[in-house]
Amino acid sequence: QVKVEKAECDTSNYNLTMVLSCPQSKEILYRAAKEWLATHIQNFQQKFQYDDKVTGTIKFRNSSYLHATKSYRQKATIDMTGTFDYMVTITIKDFKYRVKTEDAVANWHEYFIFNGTKTSNGAKSLDMKNFFLWSEDVNAMKSYSIDAGKIADGIWAQAKELEEDDF
């Protein structure tokens, strides 16, 4: 059985942290994380940035679907779609692991620009704090937080499966 020890969101930077405890060893959890990520994160090998089995650390860049809206002059609604791009750091110890997301940036291709927007190769980006201040859309962060939760849950499900296979 898994237990959530900590789940928090740093609202000043929109970093998410989840710490979970479970009966599996570091070795099983590490293997589970690598297997689950490789099969469930699209293009994982291209996103992969750091891997250290000794410290139990895995880092990669991930993307989540972005959809937000904002009313403009109480008439038209601006509908923005794109991605949240962010760093995921998974730290694994015996009977415990942490999934942390940080350095999130909103990216989109629509034509509008607002204060703080950076443009590169036709794509527009904005740090998460300014994006959420702009959008005023309480649902805008759902896919980002749900995807981080799926990673934490996927590691646990894979670890259970691996442990059962070992017997």
Region roles according to the model:
Residues 1-167:
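Ser/Thr-rich, low-complexity intrinsically disordered terminal regions
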